From Swiss-Prot:
This is Repressor of RNA polymerase III transcription MAF1 homolog. InterPro entries: Maf1, Maf1_sf. GO terms for cellular component: axon; cytoplasm; cytosol; dendrite; inhibitory synapse; nucleoplasm; nucleus; perinuclear region of cytoplasm. The modification Phosphoserine is found at S60, S65, S68, S70, S75, S214. PANTHER family: REPRESSOR OF RNA POLYMERASE III TRANSCRIPTION MAF1, REPRESSOR OF RNA POLYMERASE III TRANSCRIPTION MAF1 HOMOLOG. It is found in: Nucleus; Cytoplasm. Changing S68A: Stronger repressive effect on RNA polymerase III transcription. Much stronger repressive effect on RNA polymerase III transcription and loss of phosphorylation. Changing K35R: No interaction with RNA pol III and impaired recruitment to tRNA gene promoters. GO terms for biological process: negative regulation of transcription by RNA polymerase I; negative regulation of transcription by RNA polymerase III. It comes from the Eukaryota. The keyword Ribonucleoprotein does not apply. GO terms for molecular function: GABA receptor binding; RNA polymerase III core binding; RNA polymerase III type 1 promoter sequence-specific DNA binding; RNA polymerase III type 2 promoter sequence-specific DNA binding; RNA polymerase III type 3 promoter sequence-specific DNA binding.
Length: 256
């Protein structure tokens, strides 16, 4: 998995880390190419020892309410029971796990994550509504201006109409956001098989009474570090320019 540069996401992410007084919101949106690199290939070989890539794995039912009757299982007497569980191929499951590893490294390792920690979401509209409700309840009026910008940027990057949407819902021991003071969190994967790309949207709210600046994550530290490097380069001369091949993994997004 390779992180793809996206200036729109970078601008949005700066607005997804905010202090509301009662809580601190820390969110980010990232785009990843599903093209496997060296470490990914090695991990994929180990992953396939437990089952072939095409084998289907059972996922947990989505953590949603108000599901349509078509997504509810029925007893022999015809009575509605719990929500139906979806399945995904082991290769897709690997992509989800690899995305988590890339996004949270080096602080967390998700290599042992299992299919029951993931869910396939019932619809795009439900996910959009869930995200909007969480962020609006946290930042109120400030989210009204950000909302169209956010979803337009995601759609341009991944073509939402073509995506399968998954979520990561671990137990407390495995949850990277399960620290004391955590009010809510979500982790959504927008997977476009045609583009071989995943957009990962992760966000959490931490109670202001338990929040410490270090919990803002590596994003803030990296931003501060980059500013320091820029200041040093201005005073100490220009350094070697970095080159990037991230754009080589991109293909044009054409929504049909």
């Amino acid at each position: 998995m390779k992180l793809l540069e996206n200036s729109s996401f970078e601008a949005i992410n700066s607005q997804l880390t905010v202090e509301t007084g009662d809580a601190h919101i820390i969110g980010r949106i990232e785009s990843y190419s599903c093209k496997m690199a060296g470490d990914d290939k090695h991990m994929f070989k180990q992953f396939c020892q437990e089952g072939q890539p095409h084998v289907l794995e059972a996922l947990s039912p989505p953590q949603t309410s108000g599901l349509s009757p078509s997504r509810l299982s029925k007893s022999q007497g015809g009575e509605e029971e719990g929500p139906l569980s979806d399945k995904c191929s082991r290769k897709t499951l690997f992509y989800l796990i690899a995305t988590l590893n890339e996004s949270f490294r080096p602080d967390y390792d998700f290599s042992t994550a299992r299919s029951h920690e993931f869910s396939r979401e019932p619809s795009l509209s439900w996910v959009v509504n869930a995200v909007n409700c969480s962020l609006f309840s946290a930042v109120r009026e400030d989210f009204k201006d950000l909302k169209p910008q956010l979803w337009n940027a995601v759609d341009e990057e991944i073509c939402l109409a073509e995506c399968d949407i998954y979520s990561y819902n671990p137990d407390l021991d495995s949850d990277p956001f399960g620290e004391d003071g955590s009010l809510w969190s979500f982790n959504y994967f927008f997977y476009n098989k045609r583009l071989k790309r995943i957009v990962f949207f992760s966000c959490r709210s931490i109670s202001g009474s338990t929040y410490t600046p270090s919990e803002a994550g590596n994003e803030l530290d990296m931003e501060l570090g980059e500013e320091e490097v820029e200041e040093e380069s201005r005073s100490g001369g220009s350094g070697a320019e970095e080159t990037s091949t991230m754009e080589e993994d991109r293909v044009p997004v054409i929504c049909i």
